[in-house]
């Protein structure tokens, strides 16, 4: 089974996190730690580049980090 997140990062070298913009609610997204580029550990206050297949990447502010997920607020 192909690893879609790894494939995404091979193609989109500027993105920090793989998101589904269709899940956006009030300019916020919830993602899992494993959806971030390998080696990137998000911290509250970070600004990251969020990307999705077929969509323009967007800057996002990390506003909450838990053991299970990271909450992002889109800036663009």
Where are these regions (language model features)?
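Short, basic/aromatic beta-hairpin or loop at an interaction surface
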Residues: 10-32
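Short, well-ordered loop/turn sites that connect or cap secondary structure elements
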Residues: 40-43
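Short, solvent-exposed secondary-structure boundary/capping segments
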Residues: 67-76
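Short beta-strand-centered aromatic/proline hotspots
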Residues: 56-66
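Short, conserved secondary-structure segments in the cores of folded domains
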Residues: 36-38
């Amino acid at each position: 089974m192909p690893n879609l997140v790894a494939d995404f990062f091979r193609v989109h070298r500027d993105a920090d996190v793989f998101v589904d913009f269709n899940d956006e609610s009030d300019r916020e997204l919830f993602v899992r730690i494993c959806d971030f580029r390998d080696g990137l550990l998000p911290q509250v206050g970070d600004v990251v580049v969020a990307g999705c297949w077929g969509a323009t990447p967007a800057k996002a502010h990390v506003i909450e980090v838990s053991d299970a997920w990271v909450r992002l607020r889109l800036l663009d």
